[in-house]
């Protein structure tokens, strides 16, 4: 059992109907949902949830000029009754047109650009290295003749990878235990796009048509016929929602 964040997408809804609209969208995924003949199959995902985000870094940025709009969403208390203090210019949700996704992405884009520059500068002094995937595929095809331990040794034995892992400064440019060549793959623009796509989506997404997508699993797109990077999909989906549709962040327990 664990807690995680969910982004819920709703059709245009008046302020007084938001709580009921969220509850209706969430109902099919309740662990206690009772399957009815001809109705949706049981697909439990949660046993409790609450609106969440606008009192910390998980909230949606909103321009100060729009903060008086009554359609913006902020739940004033936690489930235990504790009062929440809203972070200025951050909300739990609201109409897509009022949520400034780019304001949230901007610092991440700047940091990604600097990481890209530093990595490219670092790699200039080394011969090109081969991504770990190449060694892993060779091991997969001939495990007896080329075991995984050998694949790892050959990958980490490359001068660039050895130097990168020996440099505390360079190690900070990419997540631990990842292949820096894979992390910085593609063009500068593609790298920044991947990094900024992590900002707005949560691990779980409930779409306008009622599809719960769990981005933490490998086959996240099975129900909707999609594959590839979940965050790129979810970020584009949220970006392109109609401006009057609501986007609300929840925390749920499963």
Where are these regions (language model features)?
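Charged, low-complexity surface segments at secondary-structure and domain boundaries
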Residues: 4-13, 96-100, 121, 213-224
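Low-complexity, serine/threonine/proline-enriched polar segments
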Residues: 37-201
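Generic structural signal of hydrophobic/aromatic residues within well-ordered alpha-helices
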Residues: 18, 22-26, 135, 139, ...
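Acidic, proline/glycine-rich low-complexity IDRs
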Residues: 164-165, 171-254
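Acidic/proline-rich low-complexity IDRs
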Residues: 5, 9, 77, 159, ...
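Short, extreme N-terminal segment that most often corresponds to the first beta-strand
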Residues: 1-57, 66, 243-254
